[in-house]
């Protein structure tokens, strides 16, 4: 499950606006409609100008988010809670779809999902990927989160394909061991820029887990290390630089899967850590990422038996 920040819907529209001109027109049109509604009956001539969310404070964004959601149907609101795979939009096809089908468009119209995640099997070439993200956005009345897992190392859905010609980064473990802050900042910037060019607006990364269990094979080298402060510093740098490229960063896997022994991709797993232990270690990178204004947090299938 992914938790977005309070003004996520506005920021999502802004990210989409910067990556797709058609999204800009939708956002501006909606804002203008709201402004017309609020000023209707005033009897005074007024002028308007285009709004940019980066120029607005959090209170204003919260207000805009409330106004926009008031205009949405219950069905649309429920749909925004879901992120689906490409395959789930057209299950008649194989899981290796690399183009948008008519059924996918029909599904998005009937079930207005909040986002779509693409995997390596959906990503073939830069032109094909950009065409696919564009067409999925076109098929959705409400701008989509277009998401992908691009952590670096073994979880690199885009860079793992040589045809994509995307910058290849080593595992988080290697980054934590050998990269300085300048190189980490460049990594966040480069990943964000290259994903944006392909039509994505959300990266399901970085991994904020602190690896305190050396036998943890699920996280393993996907963690930046066992030092919670060092991991927190890396997360802060990555989030800030990635989001400067209009790519939403996603902190994962809350409340922290670095101490577990099971694989939450195959079910749930359990930890006996206390709340104080979590606060002392696991929570620190997430707190740092949230302070850096990360747009989203991914919640793990983790049971906390002592909390």
Question: Positions of the model-derived regions?
Answer:
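Sec-dependent N-terminal signal peptides of Gram-positive bacterial secreted proteins and lipoproteins
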Residues: 23-46
